[in-house]
Every structure is written in structure tokens, then in C-alpha cells.
């Protein structure tokens, strides 16, 4: 079973995304914080990561940079999602593989998940 990790401090977003992903047959883990992001991801080894920008402890940009600098984790696709669409270029520079603006279209969300997981 493919696994997805979602980092977002908005509980409603976490619940909505989890429901959609589980309906697609994916295993989901969530975290409202980027505290120990490398350890969190290493212990789960997801096939895909969704990363919000505004998170406690460190920004999604900084967390993405850490993940992409880690030899063990750098090949896991990171989809950046944020209400601030102006941040997409910074996310790209940090190593994000894709960007979704919030609020996101559910069909676009599912399409992005399928693109990166093959489900």
C-alpha cells in the first residue's frame, strides 16, 4: 500500500485530505508540526509528502530543504500546498516537486496524488 505524509497545522485540511487519500486506497500519516521533520519522515518512509507553508517550528520551505538535502529522503516527492500562491517559486527553489494552491480543487488534488503515486 502506498503511503502519504501530510504536514499541515489546519485540522480540517488534515481530515479532508486524509479522507480523500484513504478513499483512494492510500495509507496516511499526518503531523501539525515540522518538529523533527527528518525523523518523522524517516520513520514512515512515505511515497509522497504534502507540505504546508505556515507550520509551527519551521516553515514548509525550510522543512522541504532539509528533506531534499537528506540522501535517504531526497527522492520522495514533496507537493507544496499553501493559500499563498506567491510562494510557489520559493517552494520550487526549495526542491518541491509540485504546488497546489489552497483552497484546492478536490479533482486537482486527486489528479496530483495519482500522478505521483500511480494509484
Task: Give the label of every model feature segment.
Residues 11-29:
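Two-component/phosphorelay signaling modules centered on CheY-like receiver
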Residues 14, 56, 74:
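The feature encodes the CheY-like receiver
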Residues 61-74:
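Short amphipathic alpha-helix used as the core "switch/output" element in two-component signaling
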